[in-house]
Amino acid sequence: MVEARARWTDQERFLGIATSGHAIVIDAATEKTANSPMELVLIGLCACTASDVVSILRKKREPFTSLEVRAQAERAPNPPSVYTEIKLIYRVGGKVSRKAVEDAVRLSKEKYCSVSAMLQKTAKITIAIEYFDE
């Protein structure tokens, strides 16, 4: 079982702690002293799919040198203002097979990334892949 908690610290800031014991500061207001809960959802999505892609490319022995996943998202105008559209942009460095990268991204989206699976219930997720040599 995974557990998490958020403890109010001040203003609209919280200290979030999960089963791993690591803590993060969360800012639920517009003060922007830390990431908001909805920003953390997007960061979680980026990290989830990135870890899948890295794992798959390593298993295929693809010589990638860097990977960054960015998310651009739109939210519904009315509460609870869920994400309705998310564009994931994968930026891959190195002399990698484009097919291998595309397969890894597809597998992450369709099979492995649990965050993506949850968000796809309310949001259309689209993909873009950018390649560059380092």
Label the model's feature ranges.
Residues 1-43, 53-134:
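Extended beta-strand/beta-hairpin segments
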